């Protein structure tokens, strides 16, 4: 991670000194070195195993069809509209009651 940050900061620093193709090549070399270092370290191998396991689990998921996703989306939109109307009505009642109480003169 530090290597990525150093590469990005170096890219900003060398913006005035070197042209874009040289900076792109330098950034590519820095990224390759960072990936190599990540692959040979203990944390890098754990991260790679985690990503492989995540990909395996994502393949096991039963994803909804387009029709199911559309129906679920419409249900969520409908419930949201009903809830917003309910809260608007409750808010209006509360505001009316408070206005009535604050306008009373004793």
Curated annotation (Swiss-Prot):
Source taxon at top rank: Bacteria
Listed GO biological process terms: intracellular protein transmembrane transport; protein secretion; protein targeting; protein transport by the Sec complex
Gene Ontology, cellular component aspect: plasma membrane
Keyword Repeat: no
Cellular compartment(s): Cell inner membrane
GO MF entry, a single one: protein transmembrane transporter activity
TM spans (from-to): 20-40, 75-95
PANTHER family linked to this entry: PROTEIN TRANSLOCASE SUBUNIT SECE (PTHR33910:SF1)
Name of the protein described by the UniProt record: Protein translocase subunit SecE
Organism of derivation: Haemophilus influenzae (strain ATCC 51907 / DSM 11121 / KW20 / Rd)
